[in-house]
Amino acid sequence: MHDPRRQAMAAFLDAAGWAGVRAAPLAGDASFRRYYRLGRNGSSVVLMDAPPPQEDIGPYVAIAALLRELGLSAPEVLAEDREQGFLLLEDFGDDTYTRLLAGGADEPALYTLAVDTLIALQCAATPRGTPELPSYDMERLLGEAVLLVDWYRPVASGLREEYLALWRAILPDAMVSPPTLVLRDYHVDNLILLPNRPGVRGCGLLDFQDAVTGPPGYDLVSLLEDARRDIPGPLQQAMTERYLTAFPALDRSTFSRSAAILAAQRNCKILGIFTRLWKRDGKRQYLVHIPRVWRLLEADLGHPALGPIARWLDRHLPPEARCRPDLQSEA
């Protein structure tokens, strides 16, 4: 039986000049996208298979062009078929931060480069012709925070509205101005070391197609409160200080409050998403990270601005009932 997707892929590779080259699967992510490496004569490229309607490669192409225009390292798009959902991309290799850190690489040096890249991104003047990006506004942030009570701990409609009302009251304090470009998944799985490139161009950027404009602290929180690995407290503090030193106009107290709220919102979202990936998509591998995400969330909730959320969770999802999404049922 013929596989229409395989046939479409073969036609795309033929048109791009890579016909007949073996496509070796690469590690995937939590999306519907799949990746393959193709190599010949000492060179290689990466094929992104992003099947519509679940995926749309248009934002990836636009954001990649923007990042490259800003002097940062995003993969060059070598060929594209937007209708079929195929991209042929520059191959950045295998030196992801995740892999390097697991192999004992210099952790402070890698995080310093990542923070410097984030600073450069936020300092760069937006060039003309930038794509119109969605705003990371209140409704979008609420829609993510509610994933906790939609998937991890389903609650009756009245409690759901109560939870949302608390977030509506708190989130305005997270919206520090001016808004900036937010990549949203800025963490070690999506950063790759390019040692032959100077300065911040040595930090390759991946998985940025969901970029938005939003609060400046979001990507720093994403980097330093990583759902997949523990980061030493002193390193977190040093990297936060490095970031804040680059933006002396930011009021530190205001930023600290914003960052705590964004971190808690993000961790509520992650708990919901990891549970959804298991319950809906059969991807159990993300459940191993849930205890760490709860630890991060509980630390975030120590900020006074998050007291109402902390008290709500203590009532409806007390500490002894956490870390086990398989035991959650509707309250």
Language-model region placement:
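Conserved NTP-binding catalytic cores of kinases and kinase-like/nucleotidyltransferase enzymes
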Residues: 1-86, 180, 194-204, 314-331
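An alpha-helical support segment within catalytic cores of ATP-dependent transferases
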Residues: 5, 9, 14, 126-135, ...
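ATP-binding pocket architecture of kinase catalytic cores
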Residues: 33-143, 147, 153-154, 176
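Secondary-structure capping and boundary motifs in well-ordered enzyme cores
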Residues: 140, 178, 183, 212-213, ...
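Active-site activation/catalytic loop segments of kinase-like enzymes and analogous catalytic loops
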Residues: 146-155, 216-250, 264-281, 293-301
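Residue immediately N-terminal to the catalytic "proton-acceptor" Asp
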Residues: 184, 189
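Catalytic activation segment of kinase domains across protein kinase-like and atypical kinase folds
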Residues: 191-223, 227-230
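ATP/Mg2+ or Mg2+-diphosphate-binding catalytic cores
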Residues: 272-331
